[in-house]
Curated annotation (Swiss-Prot):
It catalyses: di-trans,octa-cis-undecaprenyl diphospho-N-acetyl-alpha-D-muramoyl-L-alanyl-D-glutamyl-meso-2,6-diaminopimeloyl-D-alanyl-D-alanine + UDP-N-acetyl-alpha-D-glucosamine = di-trans,octa-cis-undecaprenyl diphospho-[N-acetyl-alpha-D-glucosaminyl-(1->4)]-N-acetyl-alpha-D-muramoyl-L-alanyl-D-glutamyl-meso-2,6-diaminopimeloyl-D-alanyl-D-alanine + UDP + H(+). Its main location: membrane. The gene is murG. Pathway: Cell wall biogenesis; peptidoglycan biosynthesis. Pfam families: Glyco_tran_28_C, Glyco_transf_28. This is UDP-N-acetylglucosamine--N-acetylmuramyl-(pentapeptide) pyrophosphoryl-undecaprenol N-acetylglucosamine transferase. One of its GO terms (molecular function) is undecaprenyldiphospho-muramoylpentapeptide beta-N-acetylglucosaminyltransferase activity. Belongs to the glycosyltransferase 28 family. MurG subfamily. Cell wall formation. Catalyzes the transfer of a GlcNAc subunit on undecaprenyl-pyrophosphoryl-MurNAc-pentapeptide (lipid intermediate I) to form undecaprenyl-pyrophosphoryl-MurNAc-(pentapeptide)GlcNAc (lipid intermediate II).
Length: 355
């Protein structure tokens, strides 16, 4: 039996912030001979994405409870019980040595199912403040890890697994030291874009003129509108794209990033070694603010919360960052990164499987 490969079930779903770090760990362990299956939901992004990465996926039926009506809340215990039962049946068939919860609604019933079968549960919290599912599961988990300090008081800080092409970028000194000309500003609103970035940055471009050149990722369906906004501000020379397929190339091009502060974005910016101006998404638990705070404290970034993200404030901030300052901030960002996060998470999974 000792010669048989170890088996891991990854539980993650809903958003790229949960799924992509899970994929990084899965590939790392598969390269070492592990068998990996995924637990997800059929109507979220993991259903298409995970099989494209050569990983088989099983589905349970579960969704979030926030913002749902009274009827949905009353039915919630039944739905959670049914999802737990589905997850139990899947795990009885696959017989994982360990399950890894990377967040999303699927982790709740999946983690409870594993615990009820005596399968150890390992958790990774990507955000600076713990999600509801992970708060519950932490009580039964064999090991809890966090990307940023503060989500769990005693958990080890291991960073977020990021893509290898971002980790492979040259260090800031090699990339940025000899640059001249306009400051290259990369504006990223995520795959859905960010309305405040799309509305504010064309006016910032007009204010800063030849001092900057901008590459603006508008998000789905907003490219024409944002191009029009730059043209209306007499700034048609700036590049606007709906999506950026090669983020590593975009980071390599940039001198500074203006963006939301989702967990994966913050971790990628640190790994790339880039200064950032963050505008956290306004959420009641201020999750994105807490994600960005370590880089601001390190002197690698500035946070402007949405009410403060005005044309004046953004223009003055960018104007105040000369090339020497940007290079110093970039080096501080890289120093704050945890480039071996994937290996650290995989090591914890291996240790729990051996125990």
């Amino acid at each position: 039996m000792s010669g048989q490969p170890k088996r891991l079930m990854v539980m993650a779903g809903g958003t790229g912030g949960h799924v992509f770090p899970g994929l990084a760990v899965a590939h790392h362990l598969m390269a070492q001979g592990w068998q990996v299956r995924w637990l997800g939901t059929a109507d979220r992004m993991e259903a298409d994405l995970v099989p494209k990465h050569g990983i088989e996926i099983d589905f349970i039926r579960i969704s979030g409870l926030r913002g749902k009506g009274v009827k949905a809340l009353l039915l919630a215990p039944v739905r959670i019980f049914n999802a737990w039962r589905q997850a139990r049946a899947i795990m009885k068939r696959f017989k994982p040595d360990v399950v890894l919860g990377m967040g999303g609604y699927v982790s709740g019933p999946g983690g409870l199912a594993a615990w009820s079968l005596g399968i150890p549960v390992v958790l990774h919290e990507q955000n600076g403040i713990a999600g509801l599912t992970n708060k519950w599961l932490a009580k039964i988990a064999s090991r809890v890890m966090q990307a940023f300090p503060g989500a769990f008081p005693k958990a080890e800080v291991v960073g977020n697994p990021v893509r290898t092409d971002v980790l492979a970028l040259p260090l800031p000194q090699a990339r940025l030291a000899g640059r001249e000309g306009p400051v290259r500003v990369l504006v990223v609103g995520g795959s859905q874009g960010a309305r405040i970035l799309n509305q504010t940055m064309p006016q910032v471009a007009a204010r800063l003129g030849d001092a900057v050149t901008i590459w603006h990722q508008s998000g789905k369906g907003a490219q024409a509108e944002v191009q029009q906004a730059y043209a209306a501000a007499s700034q048609p020379q700036h590049k606007v794209t709906e999506f950026i397929d090669d983020m590593a190339a975009a980071y390599a091009w940039a001198d500074v990033v203006v963006c939301r502060s989702g967990a994966l974005t913050v971790s990628e910016i640190a790994a790339a070694g880039l200064p950032a101006l963050f505008v956290p998404f306004q959420h009641k638990d201020r999750q994105q603010y807490w994600n960005a705070l370590p880089l601001e404290k390190a002197g690698a970034a500035k946070i402007l919360e949405q009410p403060q993200f005005t044309v004046d404030a953004v223009s003055e901030t960018l104007k105040g960052w000369d090339r020497a300052t940007l290079l110093e901030m970039a080096e501080r960002a890289r120093a704050a990164a945890i480039p071996d996060a994937t290996e650290r998470v995989a090591d914890e999974v291996r240790a729990v499987a051996r125990a």
